[in-house]
Swiss-Prot record:
Function, in words: Metallothioneins have a high content of cysteine residues that bind various heavy metals.
GO molecular function: metal ion binding
InterPro entries: Metalthion_15p
Family the UniProt entry places it in: Belongs to the metallothionein superfamily. Type 15 family.
UniProt keyword terms in alphabetical order: Metal-binding, Metal-thiolate cluster
Organism of this sequence: Vicia faba
Expression sites (tissue/organ): Expressed in the left, stem and flower, at very low levels in roots and is not detectable in mesophyll protoplasts.
The protein's name: Metallothionein-like protein type 2
């Protein structure tokens, strides 16, 4: 597992991100939380619930950071 000196890791599309990542780790994920208030009136109609979630992309099968915080080809399987 390589961390490029602790300064960056590989993020999406085998580009370097800002966290310390490595093989099988995705450093570019961010988590946000929001609070909302809702009023639900029962018995008027049907409601479709939609949930937002953070996406975890694994399309590049993990990356390794190379020299000077550049990513080597995505060779981690």
């Amino acid at each position: 597992m390589s961390c490029c000196g602790g300064n960056c890791g590989c993020g999406s599309s085998c580009k370097c991100g800002s966290g310390c990542g490595g093989c099988k780790m995705y450093a570019d994920l961010s988590y946000t939380e929001s609070t909302t208030s809702e009023t639900l009136i029962m018995g008027v109609g049907s409601e479709k619930a939609q949930y937002e979630s953070a996406e975890m992309g694994a399309e590049n099968d993990g990356c390794k950071c190379g020299a000077n915080c550049t990513c080597n080809p995505c060779t981690c399987k």
